[in-house]
Amino acid sequence: GAHLGFARGWPESPVRQGADLVIQSLHKTLPALTQTALLHANGDRIDRERIRRFEEIYQTSSPSYLLMGSIDACVRLMEAKGRQTMEAFSLLLDEFHAGLAGLDQIVLSGREIMRQGRMKDYDEGKLLIAAQGTGLWGGFLYKEMLARYHLQMEMAGDSYVTAILTPWDKEEGLMRLS
């Protein structure tokens, strides 16, 4: 996620972890327009000249200045306020998870899996809402979340939906989700 690595308590960004090539979709978790992303070449194992050749093949001769401006504004914002924004988001997520402690039927994966030692790290902004054994299926949950609660889920599986929570989600939306 493009939002990772800005504050303690969150996983490090793949760039800082040493990934050779990273594509960060800004529009998923940061305040940037849809279709915006950054490509990072990291270290000396990447042939940058080869990347430039492919860019020449696939890039447009008429770039969207609106999208490029959105990328620039997003990067500037995160440079100036990224840590502060992510720390405030962490506090909001703590409140959100505390409000979900008494759920009987629906399982929220993530923190519990971490406590069991089955995962090294995870992004608390990704929420897997699993409904195994409830008689509900993911497609139904997906549609209900939108129709009844005005919440757009990222995707649906057989027995779950995935939500992506961001620092720019309103507390009101998180309360509807809880």
Features from the language model and the residues they span:
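Conserved PLP-enzyme active-site core in the AAT-like
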Residues: 1-109
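Conserved C-terminal alpha-helix-loop-beta "cap" of PLP-dependent enzymes
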Residues: 95-178
